[in-house]
A protein has these predicted regions:
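Iron-sulfur-cluster electron-transfer modules
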Residues: 2-128, 243-251, 274-466
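Juxtamembrane/interface segments at transmembrane-helix termini
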Residues: 23-42, 94-98, 128-146, 164-172, ...
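Feature representing long, continuous alpha-helical segments
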Residues: 158, 255-258, 262, 277, ...
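Iron-sulfur cluster-binding electron-transfer modules in prokaryotic oxidoreductases
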Residues: 170-176, 219-233, 323-585
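Conserved histidines in hydrophobic membrane contexts and catalytic metal-binding motifs
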Residues: 183
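Ferredoxin-type iron-sulfur electron-transfer modules and their immediate structural context
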Residues: 191-304
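Short functional micro-motifs and their immediate structural scaffolds
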Residues: 259-265, 269, 312-325, 513, ...
């Protein structure tokens, strides 16, 4: 048994106290900044939040997903090693004061069942991760990280010194004490290292995963009162530069894994946008320097305009970050700076003057379909694509859907005064134009109960986005959801067609934002037996490149974002590709 002098005990107390004080100071500094953010955290749906923590923290489902199963398992070895060594660490320091948590029997049992196995697994895990970072060097991990190297050395040292002690490999009292102090020094070193590095996620990620909004994307509403005083409008504009509390917590939680950049369609298409840096890491130091969350103006403007707002970055993040901040920088640029890119000025002017994206009159389709009356079951919301003939081929799709409704005996009608849902204005940051369109639409739609549309962008806005500003009294469904329900109810029967290989491209708004991947497949499989999945499908779908209002930038010739998915489809050698979105189409 090692004996410690009073001086050694005092040195240990001072060392640990300074480490804990530094750690707590840095933690509280960050939390103080986070609490300056706008919009409070929500803790509704408590059982679902706890289940999410269990799945994503304890089971590591997100960490081990997206083609990173091996890295995820290695990370789990390290994380569980820290958990199982919690009691061992407490006992280790109490030994210096002659206190022992374990009797000899329990100590040996714990060593055999947990200590020894996890010491080896933890060492193997961290060495495998170090090999991946320093030898394989995945692009997503970014530049060389000396801190990661130090952490590797620290963890391996902890495991070795623990095993040396437990296996009685040292006989000399001096050697035993040196080993003990080395182990203690490394643990104390972590207290100084963690707060100043990405490894702060060890503390923050469980809380971030618990607190993160269920809604994707999650951007606080920006209500604009046209009758507000000049002071109130000034405060609104100042507020545009501030992050919300959950966005600020995201930035301090980031583990710098680069998964967001890996899946970003703009980055993959050759653009400058790097979500890991532009939306997260580049804001971290400005927040620490200023002690505040007024950092939206630090986001790279050009990168912000490249974003398709597809939410792939948010979907893949293993620590619960809502990564995308294009909405914040665009709203700041448009509303606070009055800076609208040239390619979008006509679009916004059309929305303001005519209520639709094209500044066009209604197509003949509006006259060919029945008008909605209160005795009908559904409002068929056409959207700009169909109502204003933005794509003549899409009008044929709308007519085919109405044939399905007719066959099922479902009554429906269209609204003659339907305005654009405002999605392009919302995505471009013009919240004033968006609110004007929204107010008109909500006034009409709150008179009905059920709405269906073929445009996922319209579904997101009519249902989810509008509810941030208004009480919504109606329900909106995507047309594939309606078809799937009619199939389940036996109201329509489909004879499998003669189509050969058929695949499906998941629209981002339908799969990630609305969490709907089953309904379209139910409908397709009923008609096409030879169905297969694309490489990136479901909630892992690859954006077509038209989201975030970038469809109106399609003639710019910049980047290859819009070609990536098309190339995947061609390489799949499918005969037919189906999609549930007019923009993807």
């Amino acid at each position: 048994m090692i004996k410690f002098s009073l001086l050694e005990q005092i040195v240990l107390i001072l060392f640990l106290s300074s480490g804990l004080s530094f750690f707590l100071y840095q933690l509280l500094l960050r939390l103080k900044i986070v609490l300056k953010g706008k919009s409070d955290f929500s803790i509704d749906q408590l059982p679902d939040r706890l289940l999410r923590v269990f799945n994503e923290v304890i089971l590591h489902k997100k960490v081990a997903s997206g083609g990173r199963k091996f890295a995820g398992i290695m990370h789990a070895f390290v994380m569980y090693g820290f958990i199982f060594f919690g009691l061992i660490t407490i006992n280790h320091f109490l030994m210096a004061f002659g206190i022992h948590l374990f009797n000899e029997t329990f100590r040996l049992w714990y060593f055999k069942i947990f200590g020894a196995p996890w010491a080896f697994l933890c060492s193997f895990g961290i060495l495998a991760l170090a090999y991946r970072r320093f030898v394989l060097k995945p692009k997503a991990l970014g530049k060389f990280s000396a801190t990661s190297g130090v952490v590797t050395i620290f963890i391996v040292t902890l495991m070795i010194t623990y095993l040396i002690d437990e296996l009685y490999l040292l006989k000399s009292p001096v050697a035993l004490k040196v080993n003990w102090w080395l182990h203690s020094g490394v643990i104390g070193g972590f207290l100084f290292l963690i707060p100043k590095s990405k490894h702060m996620h060890l503390v923050l990620s469980p809380f971030n995963i618990f607190l993160k909004p269920f809604e994707i994307p999650h951007h606080p509403a920006i209500p604009i009162d046209l009758e507000a005083s000049e002071e109130e409008l000034d405060n609104l504009l100042l507020d545009l530069s501030r992050l919300s509390k959950d966005q600020a917590l995201d930035i301090f939680t980031c583990v710098e894994c680069g998964r967001c950049t890996d899946v970003c369609p703009a980055n993959r298409g050759g653009g400058i946008l790097d979500p890991k840096y532009h939306f997260i890491l580049n804001l971290k130091q400005p927040m620490l320097d200023s002690g505040d969350v007024n950092v939206v103006d630090k986001i790279n403007v050009e990168a912000g305009w490249e974003c398709t707002t597809c939410q792939a970055c948010t979907e893949v993040c293993p620590v619960g970050n809502h990564v995308e901040k294009a909405d914040e920088i665009r709203s700041f640029q448009v509303l606070a700076e009055g800076d609208v890119p040239q390619e979008y000025q006509k679009l916004l002017r059309n929305l303001q003057e005519t209520g639709n994206t094209e500044g066009a009159s209604s197509s003949d389709l509006l006259k060919q379909l029945p008008a909605y009356t209160s005795d009908k079951e559904l409002v068929l919301w056409l959207g700009c694509f169909a109502k204003h003939a933005m794509d003549p081929n899409f009008i044929g799709s709308v007519k085919n859907f109405t044939k399905i409704l007719d066959s099922a005996g479902v009554t429906y009608g269209v609204l003659s005064n339907e305005q654009c849902s405002g999605d392009p204005a919302n995505k471009l940051g013009d919240k004033l134009t968006y609110q004007l369109l929204m107010d008109q639409n909500v006034e009409e739609l709150n008179k009905v109960k059920n709405v269906t549309t073929m445009c996922p962008h319209c579904v997101v806005n009519l249902q989810k986005e509008y509810s941030k500003y208004h009480e919504i009294k109606y329900e909106v469904k995507h047309h594939t959801q309606v078809i799937s329900e009619l199939l389940e109810q036996g109201k329509i029967n489909i004879n499998p067609g003669s189509l050969e290989k058929v695949t499906y491209h998941d629209p981002c708004n339908l799969s990630r934002t609305l969490d709907e991947v089953s309904a379209p497949r139910n409908a397709i499989k009923a008609a096409a037996p030879d169905f297969f999945e694309l490489d990136e499908s479901g909630k892992e779908t690859l954006c077509c490149g038209a989201g975030g209002a970038l469809w109106w930038k399609k003639d710019s010739g910049e980047g290859r974002t819009h070609l990536l998915r098309a190339e995947q489809v061609i390489e799949s050698k499918t005969d037919t590709v189906v999609t549930g979105c007019n923009f993807c189409y």
